[in-house]
């Protein structure tokens, strides 16, 4: 009965058309917040050749205020044991039927894109995203911008040099035009490197602390949980990445940890290019796959990753998992400081992640090690301005209300956990976060 009610509610909420006239380039509107904060003239390294091919560009659509209110109510009902909608999760197509764009609106935008010379790659099941491909020249003409390269910390990055414009006929429906830059979120793990100089300890303690799966199972009392039959059987865990991995590394780790080797199911995001390996990213994903498989040995693990196209990254892996409803849990070990993303990009992500919640997908991410100084880097001549780096800001998506940030394996004392500089408390620009004075206990003694 509850399932029938959920289906009936969705059917009764078919989205109404929002684009009332055919879009035309004769009347354009600027999209505020679409200029990347690091695309600055002082870092400019020249214009991108007009024939450069860009695949998988995306237009993400916003919801109406009525849709947003209805979605918020649905998320509350799905978590309310007394509601008939309790834990009645939606499929992506059910989500589209209630919270996506009308098909007629999608058709109008696709027609305009094709008139600009773009080829349509796909439309999301949630009917909130169109992917298309074309050249840099077509992008410049269609969105009234220029594509430039920028030198950022020794890397050559590309991005639009101005805010983007779209036809006024559908500008109010657009949350973001994405995948036009090669800024990539960074892995949150820190490889072990001996400090130099090192303290001369007067005891047998080395000062270096390392954890194996057995240690973590003791620290978080996982052995009793697994012994009770809660080993992940029947659950699916998605690891999101942006590099290919070595499955041999994963198998060797499982064997060394005393677990039966079990390879993850690997999925290369369609359209993201050929499978490619990136050193820092491979290490992060190796780590995630190794630990998730040993801590929940009964779970099915998917590894969803992007290929060699530079304008794809781990956030596209997350989008794919959500739009295809892969995984009860989506695990992300990447982040970027809030100030290092354009406002429209954050708006896009904050529109996607509630869909995961409505579909019963739990999202977890690494909290990161930078606390309230997530933007800080080692200053170089091609670093973002120092004022930007030193601003109080935290990592995203750890700061999102729809994502659970996980950390704590360094086992610090409570005064560090509740410290402003240690956690980034109240340093988010966009979302409400716990204050440093809030009593939060996350350290389990053992």
Name each region found by the language model.
Residues 14-126, 131, 136-408, 441:
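Substrate-binding/charge-relay-adjacent region of secreted/lumenal peptidase catalytic domains
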């Amino acid at each position: 009965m509850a399932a029938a009610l959920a289906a009936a509610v969705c059917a009764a909420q078919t989205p109404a058309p929002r684009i009332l006239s055919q879009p035309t380039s004769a009347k354009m509107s600027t999209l505020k917040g679409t200029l990347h904060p690091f695309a600055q003239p002082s870092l400019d390294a020249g214009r991108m050749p007009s024939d450069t091919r860009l695949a998988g560009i995306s237009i993400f659509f916003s919801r109406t205020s009525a849709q947003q209110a209805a979605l918020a109510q649905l998320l509350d009902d799905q978590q309310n044991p007394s509601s008939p909608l309790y834990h009645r999760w939606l499929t992506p197509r059910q989500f589209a039927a209630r919270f996506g764009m009308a098909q007629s609106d999608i058709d109008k935008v696709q027609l305009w894109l094709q008139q600009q010379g773009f080829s349509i790659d796909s439309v999301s099941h949630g009917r909130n995203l169109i992917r298309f491909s074309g050249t840099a020249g077509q992008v410049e003409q269609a969105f009234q911008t220029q594509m430039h390269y920028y030198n950022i910390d020794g890397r050559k990055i590309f991005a639009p040099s101005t805010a983007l414009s779209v036809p006024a006929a559908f500008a109010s429906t657009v949350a973001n035009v994405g995948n036009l830059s090669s800024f990539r979120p960074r892995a949150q793990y820190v490889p072990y490197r001996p400090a130099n100089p090192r303290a001369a300890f007067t005891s047998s303690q080395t000062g270096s602390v390392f954890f194996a799966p057995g240690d973590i199972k003791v620290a978080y009392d996982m052995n009793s949980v697994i012994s009770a039959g809660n080993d992940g059987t029947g659950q699916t865990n998605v690891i999101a990445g942006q590099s290919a991995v070595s499955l041999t590394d994963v198998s060797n780790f499982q064997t060394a940890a005393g677990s039966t080797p079990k390879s993850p199911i690997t999925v290369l995001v369609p359209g993201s290019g050929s499978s490619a390996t990136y050193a820092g990213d491979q290490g992060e994903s190796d780590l995630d796959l190794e630990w998730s498989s040993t801590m929940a040995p009964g779970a099915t693990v998917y590894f969803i990753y992007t290929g060699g196209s530079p304008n794809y990254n781990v956030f596209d892996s997350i989008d794919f998992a959500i739009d295809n409803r892969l995984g009860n849990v989506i695990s992300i070990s990447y982040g970027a400081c809030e100030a290092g993303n354009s406002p429209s990009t954050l708006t896009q992500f904050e529109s996607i992640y509630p869909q995961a919640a409505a579909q019963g997908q739990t999202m977890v991410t690494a909290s990161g090690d930078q606390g309230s100084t997530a933007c800080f880097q080692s200053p170089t001549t091609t670093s973002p301005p120092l004022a930007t780096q030193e601003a109080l800001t935290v990592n995203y998506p750890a700061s999102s209300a729809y994502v659970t940030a996980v950390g704590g394996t360094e086992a610090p004392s409570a005064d560090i956990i509740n410290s402003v500089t240690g956690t980034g408390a109240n340093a988010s620009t966009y979302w409400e976060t716990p204050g440093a004075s809030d009593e939060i206990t996350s350290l389990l003694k053992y």
